[in-house]
C-alpha cells in the first residue's frame, strides 16, 4: 500500500521544516518552490531555507524565550535547529549560523529524502487536497490573491530589511575591538563613537534617508527588524538607546562606555564576513557606503553585501487560523511561517514543524494536535488563533505567551510572592520543555530526545537582528 501524499508550497524555513516533519511520519511530500525559475527581491540563491535578514536564531538557555523554543525543536529532531547547530558560528549567547552552510545543509536533507519530491515552479492557486502553505513573506501576488479569496481576509503587509555585510580585512582593529556586552564573550566587533562622531553619522543617515523613494510615514515595519534610518527618524538619541547602545562595552582605550557603539557579528564559519547588528537598511547603495564609512573603524569598509528592504506578507491569523494551524475555511489547508503571522526564523520553522506534523496526521487519518499551553510553541500558536484581530501584527516568542507559575504566598505577609526574572524563567523553561516532550512523545507519537540546555544566566536578549 502506497503512502499518502501531501503538498507543501514554499521551501523556506517553514516549508522545508514542514516537508521533513511530514516525511519523518512516513507521508510522501510534493514540495513546490518557485526559485530559481522566479526569484524574489530578497533572495540571492536557489537554496532552500535561505536567510535573507539576520543569521541569528535568537538567544540560548533557560533565561531566553527563544531558548525554550529551540530546546523544544531539538527534542523532536527538527531540521532547522539541527541544521543551525551543525553550521553555527560564534555569537556569544545567541544561536547564529553560517548563512550559506546552513541553507546548504537544509537543502541537502530535503533533496536527499526518499519521500520528498521537489517541484520547481510557481504555485498560483491553493493546491487541492491536504496542503501546507508556507510561501513566506514574499508570497507571489497570484497565490496571495487566491488565499485572500479562500479566507475572505484582507492581505496585510509590513516592511523588512537586511543589514550590510563587511569584509573583516577592511575593519580597522586599531579603533575597533572584540568583546561582548559585560565581557560575556569576545564574539562581537565593536566600533566606538564619540559624541561628535555620532552626531556626524546621524546627520549623514538623515540626509541619506531623504534620498530614498520611500514614504517613510506610510510604511509599516516590524519592530524587531526595523531599518536603522527609520529608527533614526524617531529621534537623534533613539539609535544609541537601541542597536547602537554602548551599555556593557568598556572601550579598552578609555576603560569607559563610549557615547555609542556599532557592533558587528560574524556571518560565516571562517570569520571573513561580519554584519552590522541592527543596521537593516533600505538606503541606496551609494548612500549606504558613505554612511557605513562614517562609523569609526569602518572608514575603509568593503561592503560585500548591501542591505535591502522588501515587503512582507502575512494573514490576519486570529481571523482565519486554528491553533492547529489549519485554515478555518478549509481544514485540509494549513499555514506556517511568516504567512501565518509569526516573526522570526525560529518561529517560522517551529510552526512549519507543527503544520507538517498535523498535515501528515490528517493524511494518516489522525486528528491534528495543538502543543500544550505551557510550551513556547503551544503558547505561540494559541496566540495566533486567539489574539485580537484588530491591528494584528506578526508575533515572535516571549514569556508572556505561556501561563504564569502557580502563585506562592509569603507566609509573613500573607501576600503573593513576587518573583524576579531569574527566579521565574528557569522553572518556566523546565515546565514548558517537559510538557512539550511529554506531548510530543505520547500524543504526537514522534521520537523525543531530551536536549542539552546551555546555561546562560543573562536576561532576555533584545529583539535586535
Curated annotation (Swiss-Prot):
- Gene Ontology cellular-component annotations: cytosol
Function, in words: Catalyzes the folate-dependent formation of 5-methyl-uridine at position 54 (M-5-U54) in all tRNAs.
Q: Which domain of life is it from?
A: Bacteria
**What's the source species for this entry?**
Deinococcus radiodurans (strain ATCC 13939 / DSM 20539 / JCM 16871 / CCUG 27074 / LMG 4051 / NBRC 15346 / NCIMB 9279 / VKM B-1422 / R1)
The EC number(s) given in the record are 2.1.1.74
Query: What InterPro entries does its record include?
Result: FAD/NAD-bd_sf (IPR036188), MnmG-rel (IPR002218), MnmG-rel_CS (IPR020595), MnmG_N (IPR040131), TrmFO (IPR004417)
Q: Which GO terms fall under molecular function for this chain's record? A: flavin adenine dinucleotide binding; tRNA (uracil(54)-C5)-methyltransferase activity, 5,10-methylenetetrahydrofolate-dependent
Question: What's in the keyword line of the UniProt record?
Answer: Cytoplasm, FAD, Flavoprotein, Methyltransferase, NAD, NADP, Transferase, tRNA processing
Q: What is this protein called?
A: Methylenetetrahydrofolate--tRNA-(uracil-5-)-methyltransferase TrmFO
- PROSITE patterns for the chain: GIDA_2
Query: Which parts of the sequence bind FAD?
Result: 10-15
Which family does this protein fall into?
A: Belongs to the MnmG family. TrmFO subfamily.
Might you name a Gene Ontology BP term for this protein?
Answer: tRNA wobble uridine modification
TM annotation in the entry: none
Encoding gene per record: trmFO
Q: What is the lineage of its organism?
A: Bacteria, Thermotogati, Deinococcota, Deinococci, Deinococcales
Q: Where in the cell?
A: Cytoplasm
